[in-house]
Amino acid sequence: MTPWNLVGMARVKGLDVIALTDHNTARNTPEAMAAGEAYGVQVIPGMEITSREEVHILGYFSSVPEALAAGEAVYAHLPQVQNQPALFGNQIIIGADDSPSGTLEKLLINATDLSVEEVCALVRAFGGVPVPAHINRGSNGMIGALGLMPFLPDYPVVEVYPGVPCPAYATKGRFVIHSSDAHRLEDIQERIFSLDTHPTARDVMRLLRALDGRQIPQNGI
């Protein structure tokens, strides 16, 4: 699933704003942004970071430079375990015209040596918004990995996996987002929610950042 294929399918599905969140890297965000410009889809640069507890934390950023800088920091915290293409496939960096321009050597599906709290702090240090991913999913969700949804530190925004029960306490007092968590083109879902205001990626990031600080914008998005 290349950036251009991903954004093209999002266009077909009628999605206006999407986020690209590869595991533990943001190296493909530049081409995703280029594809978004071409297809008329707003793209939020990001990544899905694996903590040492095997919890997935989404990091959303306002710009490609922020995402790339955060991605380099995350990559440095991965163990020195090389990818085995025969088992896991090539970890390709996509360049211009959707063509391969390189590969990433470390195995990206590994956990970093950062705790959940440290991952969130790193994302915020680079200007991003951390969001615990699919908290209600058995694998790599916060509830499944930790046995509960912690109240501290504060997680103002959480992502819930659709179609799977989620304990009410886990989302109480929190802002909830949903995603298709697509790893294949056919997994990309059609939109569930729509807004009359036609928000841009910048608008969505402004709202997420406000929610992360538990500030409700007076004029909404």
Regions found by a protein language model. Give the residues of each.
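Alpha-helix-centered segments that form part of catalytic cores
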Residues: N90-F126
